[in-house]
Amino acid sequence: NLVGLCLIFTGVLIWYSKDYNNKLEIQDLPSSRSIYTGIIQGLAILPGVSRSGVTISILRIFGLNPLKAAKFSFLIFIPAILGATLLQLNEASRTLEEVGGSSILLGFLASSISSFLSIKFLIRLIDKQQFHYFTPYCFLVGIFLIYEGLI
């Protein structure tokens, strides 16, 4: 099961990166490492790969401190989400006509609030050196999905 394997991969990367607590600043990160991080972000196209999980982990391995890694990870997501939005504009206009503006607005508001709270929670975990707490979740759900796929 691809999703299960990808969750386990994400868990391994998060666990492996937990002991990296370097002090490198974003401006000191070599350009090549920024490019690698952007490429690794592309792994999130695979189901079960956490985009923020893999990018934060790889940035920590590259030497960024945990909070800077998280902030950089969220910044490099902006071009990806803007690109996806541009690709979907035509479809979005049809959906807006079908669903109605108030429903879209409520969905946008709920999504914005939950995203803000999720990011705040994640930053708090990272600040407390507890990002690796996601590892058991990744392993357990990954193993469960693989097991279910074998039955």
Language-model features and meaning:
Residues 1-151:
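Multi-pass membrane proteins that catalyze or facilitate reactions on polyprenyl-/lipid-phosphate substrates
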